[in-house]
Amino acid sequence: MTPYIVILSTGSELTAGRSVDTNSGWIANQLFELGWKVKKIITLPDDPNLIFKELEALQSLAKEIPVLAIMTGGLGPTEDDYTLETVLKLTGKTSYAVEKAKIRLTKIYEARGKDYKDILPTVFRQTNVPEGCKTLDNSVGIAVGFIESLGENSYLVCMPGVPSEMTEMFKRRLVPELKKMYPRENLIQKTKWLWNIGESLFQNEFIEPNREVYFKETEWGVTANRGYIKCIFQSTNDVMLDTILKSLEKQYPDLISDDVFQYVHEQLLYEKWTISVVESCTGGLLGKKLTERAGSSAYFMGGFLTYSNEMKSNLLGIPKETIETFGAVSDEVAFAMVDGLCLKTGTDFGVSITGIAGPEGGSEEKPVGTVCIGLKEPNGKIKVHRYLFPGNRESIRENASNTALFLIYQSLKGKVV
């Protein structure tokens, strides 16, 4: 059974443009990976009448077809949080406090001191849910999520709008419930990443020529990221999926990868190798990404942010003449940066990044987006790669740090870097 899926994000900060709705896109992508397609995404202000009108329309639609509505926001403690109130009006139910959540909230606020303890009665509303609903525990925050029936095989899911709370609740609490509510046939999913290639080029080069051969019974989707695209293929035919992946690997042998971030983490742990970084234009982004997973302290030894030429010379021992002759953004300086880094840290792997992130600083010879990435491997070999990344400052920095991780991935895979 496939429901008609609608995502609703509530919050006047969203409709006023003060905040960006990241929840809807994230939920839609998660649902696609589970084999479901979203039909509509709606953004609403904190207006109980507008919210009620949309929910009432979905309740009416649920009389004809299965509907799954997923709503985020409006479960907080303030007077502009209308989700529970609106759902109670829609269903004609009363609410009750989830005792476990109420006890947890009490402990948290009492620990914060008298001022917080005094406002407990007003914040208890976050623990209230409709009678008879399925509750969704909040392991990160306070507000309790819930699943309310909209009719036969139709449901309204309400979750907090805080992204960290919503994502954890979705993955740990909601997904198991969705699989019970809407059992799927044995859908198989395969995912690959392709580097330095855009969505449109991928569709033109791979999807269109193979549409009649591969994609009559296989769903596909692409998520664009900085430096790579994430390609997802879904089918009940595992043989067809394997054929598609083999064809993909044949066409893009040097650009294809699995989840780079996870593989680098797991492989560095497995091999007991260490790594250090020296960054200029990326300002620590690579170090941040290498340390996002628990356990990274086993392999990440540290790094340097050598933004100025003086720091490059003083910390890494790069001759000033080298910088003056070739420029701070050059193959020669990227080589010297990673060489000096590994002399200091003694790590198995070393990575250097130097570039022009813009918007100023570019030239005809080295335009904005020029980035040099140096990689030292455990065998002592150093190779420098030069790129010209598109986009604004943020995009160039993200492209550079992600591509550096891809180079580490390729080296760990034993590919020629």
Swiss-Prot record:
InterPro entries: CinA, CinA-like_C, CinA_C, Competence-induced_CinA, MoaB/Mog-like_dom_sf, MoaB/Mog_dom. SMART domains: MoCF_biosynth. It holds the Pfam family MoCF_biosynth. Gene3D superfamilies: CinA-like, MoaB/Mog-like domain. Belongs to the CinA family. NCBIfam families: PncC_domain. This is CinA-like protein. It comes from Leptospira biflexa serovar Patoc (strain Patoc 1 / ATCC 23582 / Paris).
